[in-house]
Regions:
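Conserved acidic catalytic loop of the alpha/beta-hydrolase fold
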Residues: 108-126
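Catalytic histidine neighborhood in serine/cysteine hydrolases
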Residues: 297-312
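Short beta-strand/loop motif that positions the catalytic acidic residue
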Residues: 269, 276-278
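Catalytic histidine-centered segment of alpha/beta-hydrolase-like enzymes
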Residues: 309-321
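A catalytic-pocket lid/entrance helix-loop region that shapes and gates access to the active site
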Residues: 149-196
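Conserved HGGG/HGGXW glycine-rich cap/lid loop of the alpha/beta-hydrolase fold
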Residues: 40-98
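Conserved hydrolase catalytic core segment
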Residues: 124-163
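Conserved alpha/beta-hydrolase "acid-adjacent" motif
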Residues: 283-289
Length: 331
């Protein structure tokens, strides 16, 4: 899950809601990556970029979705004088190829990609920074490779459980009924009996006339529910397809993890420091998951509930909490 798809391209894109988001001047300057590359992973070519200071503290930015991809705005969260920031587009996302591809695209594949990327860049350990699905993948990678992680900054916690997916598909719309009506009205009455499978079938259809409208309904629904202040937002094009198709692909496969895998294995990473930042009014990833994670983690985890925010990285309170956490880890 992400919800940041239409927001990362520009802060305060809607002038009526501008004050709800961090001001442009409060982020770090726009900087070009000092290096770009691709990992050859067989069917998949994984795009990555590096920015900031080459000998700075290594941090890996893990985007949401699955399928949301990275944006130049994401680079602006990281102090270029203190961090060596690595960003990458997960399989099927952003500039990685093939776009929207679901074959050989599992959580285990993504974990392996991260580890290959770390080895290729010669990084011993790195800080993991991920929100929404990015928090899921960060946690799954840390559980698989705890010795390679120096700490975690997590936002909008999604633990990849069936209950959370059911909430997204059936209950989130109680708070954003207009967006939910647009989401389910694309399906026939019969198809609404299993929303996930019905959307998955359409999103996997090779014909653009079938998969693209479904993708835009799905991505627009999620993005419209991403902030405390409501706003109907339309997401179109390639980004809508990768986000919707890959989310449905992962959800129909239980995120390729045993149910409750993360909390059942939290002991593996309990020794690592973590900052967990959660919008109190996040309806995409409700606060109960962040609360459960922090409770299971113990005293090495700090949970900060942001009372005046929803799900988006760039909402004012969340963005400032993320910047503060990055300052602490940079010391």
């Amino acid at each position: 899950m992400s919800g940041d798809l239409s927001l990362a391209a520009g802060i305060g894109y809607d002038h009526a809601m501008a004050h709800a988001f961090i001001e442009d001047k409060e982020l770090f300057p726009v900087l070009a990556p000092f290096a770009k590359g691709r990992l050859d992973r067989g069917l998949h070519q994984i795009y990555y970029e590096q920015c900031g200071r080459p000998n700075g503290k290594p941090v890996l930015f893990i985007h949401g979705g699955p399928g949301a991809g990275i944006s130049p705005t994401h680079r602006r969260l990281f102090n270029p004088d203190r961090y060596h920031c690595v960003l990458f587009d997960q399989r099927g996302s952003g500039q990685s190829l093939p776009h929207g591809e679901t074959a050989q695209n599992t959580t285990q594949d993504l974990i392996a990609d991260i580890e290959v990327l770390r080895q290729q860049l010669g990084i011993e350990q790195w800080l993991l920074f991920g929100g929404s699905w990015g928090s899921t993948l960060a946690l799954a990678y840390a559980i698989a490779h705890p010795e390679r992680v120096s700490g975690l900054i997590l936002r909008g916690i999604f633990l990849g459980t069936r209950a959370e997916v059911d909430w997204f598909l059936h209950d989130m719309g109680r708070f954003f009924p207009e967006a939910y009506d647009q989401f389910v009205s694309y399906l026939t009455v019969e198809e609404r009996g299993d929303i996930l499978l019905s959307y998955h079938e359409k999103l996997m259809d090779p014909q653009a006339l079938v998969h693209q409208p479904a993708a835009e309904r799905w991505a627009s629904y999620e993005t419209s529910c991403s902030t405390l202040r409501a706003g109907m937002r339309r997401v179109t094009g390639r980004s809508a397809l990768s986000m919707a198709r890959l989310e449905a692909h992962y959800f129909v496969n239980d995120c390729f993890m045993p149910n409750n895998h993360i909390l059942q294995n939290i002991k593996v990473i309990r020794h690592l420091p973590a900052h967990i930042i959660q919008g109190r009014h996040d309806v995409i990833c409700p606060p109960v998951s962040a609360h459960r994670l922090a409770d299971a983690w113990g005293n090495r985890a700090t949970l900060r509930m942001v009372d005046d925010a929803g799900h988006s990285t760039f909402e004012n309170g969340i963005a400032h909490a993320l910047l503060s956490a990055l300052d602490e880890f940079a010391v």
